[in-house]
Amino acid sequence: MTGGLNKDFDWVVAKFEEMIKRETEVSIAIPTIRILIDVIRKSNSTTVVGLQKELEDAVKQLKSCPYNQSISLSSVCDSFIRFVTKRTELDFPNFDTCKSNLVERGEQLSNKSSMSRTKISQLADKFIRDGVTILVHGFSRVVLGLLLHAAFQGKRFSVIVTESRPDSSGYKTAARLQAANIPVKLIMDGGVSRIIDKVDYVLVGAEAIVENGGIVNKIGTYQISIVAKAFKKPFYVAAESFKFTRSYPLNQSDIENLKNDHISEPFKACRSCSSCENPEQLTIDSPTLDYTPPSYITLLFTELGVLTPSAVSDELIKLYC
């Protein structure tokens, strides 16, 4: 054991990173669930308690891996443990039967997660009408899938995408939409208030949906929601239910307690700027996430249904009880 981690599960991180590199378009939930199913299959434990301990050790390894730059991975792991091991000893007193059933439950969760984006796209389809203009921030595979689904259905709409600094992920979104022949325009992050009167609504993804119905997402999401509310524009969120998390941030500083979300090399252009005499002496704050309170969110599109922020706590109760 080193730093609280069980070295017997080093293979978990190696396999996870391999799957992430190979399957770039899948939800983070899929490789995570597959690996945890493998942990159950490979387990030599002869008791439920021992097997649960192995799963917990594997989860610790996953949560500590270098890839874990978001809180989504933690949410998936917690969802797996909750769903798969719920009331295990009571339901299956025979351990071999119990182990087989845990694998079966894991496969059910994997299949459910695989279909979640399709379900979200279908549920949100009626909100994309011909002629609408949608403002998108950052890169979200759920949001992208939703828009591509609507275009495939023959909907005619246009999209405005923010650059989404500091990683400029908006360029990736814009390129994918352009490749699908969806009219798209890229704008600076600071230009949202300039164009907000031209959009019909805002659509964003989420790294996490918290207990009060608010979201944690790409930095800049909160200020876009403020502008949207000031101009009376609907603010929609599209995300899978595995991103529901039992956390309750009260302000922006609480985000750092959820995840260390600062990037190590922010604003390289600034550091090399010729007008800065000593760029290395600049103090730069570079968070990647912010918290948007539920009062700024109109609806959330999930595979569980189209929810109001106030309905999120009810869904969490169903998931955790």
Swiss-Prot record:
<dbReference type="GO" id="GO:0005085">
    <property type="term" value="F:guanyl-nucleotide exchange factor activity"/>
</dbReference>
<keyword id="KW-0648">Protein biosynthesis</keyword>
<comment type="subunit">
    <text>Component of the translation initiation factor 2B (eIF2B) complex which is a heterodecamer of two sets of five different subunits: alpha, beta, gamma, delta and epsilon. Subunits alpha, beta and delta comprise a regulatory subcomplex and subunits epsilon and gamma comprise a catalytic subcomplex. Within the complex, the hexameric regulatory complex resides at the center, with the two heterodimeric catalytic subcomplexes bound on opposite sides.</text>
</comment>
<dbReference type="InterPro" id="IPR042529">
    <property type="entry name" value="IF_2B-like_C"/>
</dbReference>
<dbReference type="GO" id="GO:0002183">
    <property type="term" value="P:cytoplasmic translational initiation"/>
</dbReference>
<keyword id="KW-0963">Cytoplasm</keyword>
<dbReference type="InterPro" id="IPR051501">
    <property type="entry name" value="eIF2B_alpha/beta/delta"/>
</dbReference>
<dbReference type="GO" id="GO:0005851">
    <property type="term" value="C:eukaryotic translation initiation factor 2B complex"/>
</dbReference>
<comment type="similarity">
    <text>Belongs to the eIF-2B alpha/beta/delta subunits family.</text>
</comment>
<dbReference type="GO" id="GO:0003743">
    <property type="term" value="F:translation initiation factor activity"/>
</dbReference>
<dbReference type="GO" id="GO:0005829">
    <property type="term" value="C:cytosol"/>
</dbReference>
<keyword id="KW-0396">Initiation factor</keyword>
<comment type="function">
    <text>Acts as a component of the translation initiation factor 2B (eIF2B) complex, which catalyzes the exchange of GDP for GTP on eukaryotic initiation factor 2 (eIF2) gamma subunit. Its guanine nucleotide exchange factor activity is repressed when bound to eIF2 complex phosphorylated on the alpha subunit, thereby limiting the amount of methionyl-initiator methionine tRNA available to the ribosome and consequently global translation is repressed.</text>
</comment>
<protein>
    <recommendedName>
        <fullName>Translation initiation factor eIF2B subunit alpha</fullName>
    </recommendedName>
</protein>
<dbReference type="InterPro" id="IPR042528">
    <property type="entry name" value="elF-2B_alpha_N"/>
</dbReference>
<dbReference type="GO" id="GO:0006413">
    <property type="term" value="P:translational initiation"/>
</dbReference>
<dbReference type="InterPro" id="IPR037171">
    <property type="entry name" value="NagB/RpiA_transferase-like"/>
</dbReference>
<dbReference type="InterPro" id="IPR000649">
    <property type="entry name" value="IF-2B-related"/>
</dbReference>
<dbReference type="Pfam" id="PF01008">
    <property type="entry name" value="IF-2B"/>
</dbReference>
